Design a protein with these regions (language model features):
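Short helix/strand-capping hinge loops at secondary-structure junctions
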Residues: 72, 78-80
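N-terminal glycine-/serine-/threonine-rich beta1-alpha1-beta2 phosphate-ribose binding loop
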Residues: 1-73, 86-102
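A cross-family glycoside hydrolase active-site/sugar-binding cleft signature
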Residues: 55, 78, 106-108
Length: 174
């Protein structure tokens, strides 16, 4: 784990400890942690593996994705990958670079694998159920899907505490 010191890191490590110490089927994760403001540069210089998981504060995510792909790392990025339209071209270039470098750049939005999402997709493709899809446009899409980050939610049965940056659209996104 490479991260700045603070409540996000502590919350993550506490959650890992809960998994490691639960009564039923405990995990045995051994977290090796580097804390510091230079966490990203340290991770790139040490390159302890070939996959990086990017989650947390989204302000610099497009940069972190790009730099990771350029370093030859496979990237699993939590949503959203970008929070401002200006970063779309950067993200698009990162996907192209990932292809050139033979690495994976993947959005790990777990919701896409939930049965309700899979059923929605299947039903939308069944004309006898859904009907014919109307023509849409960028300003007026035919179909929209909204994913909500709830202020209050449970993670593994424990209330998730949101850190201050979560409420800042310049860091979390809208």
């Amino acid at each position: 784990v490479y991260a700045p010191d603070g409540p996000d890191l502590q919350q993550h490590l506490s959650r890992i400890n809960l998994y490691n110490t639960r009564a039923t089927d405990p995990a045995s994760w051994n977290e090796i942690v580097y804390k510091g403001d230079d966490f990203f540069e340290k991770m790139l210089s040490e390159k302890p593996g070939n996959v990086v998981v990017l989650s947390g504060n989204n302000r610099k995510k497009a940069e972190y994705i790009t730099r990771s792909v350029e370093a030859g790392l496979n990237v699993l990025a939590d949503k959203p990958m970008i929070i401002v339209p200006e970063d779309f071209a950067t993200l698009e270039a990162a996907f192209n670079k990932a292809g050139e470098n033979g690495v994976l750049l993947y959005d790990i939005m777990t919701e896409r694998f939930e049965i309700t999402t899979i059923l929605q997709k299947l039903l939308s493709q069944e004309e006898s159920v859904f009907g014919k899809l109307e023509a849409g446009s960028e300003k007026d899409p035919a179909v929209t899907k909204v994913s909500v980050n709830h202020f209050s939610k449970l993670v593994s049965g424990v209330p998730l505490q949101r850190t201050a940056w979560f409420f800042d659209v310049d860091q979390q996104g809208e």
